[in-house]
Amino acid sequence: MITMKIIKTEYDKIKPYITKDGSIIRELLHPNIYKGVKQSLAEAIVPVGSKTLLHKHYTSEEIYYILEGRGLMTLDNEKFEVKKGDTIYIPPKTPHKIENIGNVPLKILCCSYPPYSHEDTEILE
């Protein structure tokens, strides 16, 4: 039998912060907080009428899952609309940003591997 440590977070106890790209982030799981975790999972919120800055991550790949709202995603030279239920894969070194084009906050579940770090992120605009 394999023994494991159960990690459970409580949303209301996680303090949000503003990241380099301008989105409001809640780190749901991150190895800086929970030892043994190998990736990061965060909720990003882009307020109505706002967008993130164009940026890229040198080593991290990201997966975005749209929880709520509508957005205009820029991924390298492509632009396309996203909505609740959509999933977007973002390879390392790929310039990307997202704009809230809806009338409610755009909520995104972001999974990163290796885990998100400010040092791995370059703002491009």
Curated annotation (Swiss-Prot):
InterPro entries in the cross-refs: Cupin_2 (IPR013096), PKS_Associated_Protein (IPR052044), RmlC-like_jellyroll (IPR014710), RmlC_Cupin_sf (IPR011051)
Gene3D superfamilies named among the record's database cross-references: Jelly Rolls
Superkingdom, natural source: Archaea
SUPFAM superfamilies: RmlC-like cupins (SSF51182)
Residues annotated as domain Cupin type-2: 45-110
Protein name: Uncharacterized protein MJ1618
Species whose genome carries this gene: Methanocaldococcus jannaschii (strain ATCC 43067 / DSM 2661 / JAL-1 / JCM 10045 / NBRC 100440) (Methanococcus jannaschii)
Upper taxonomic lineage: Archaea, Methanobacteriati, Methanobacteriota, Methanomada group, Methanococci
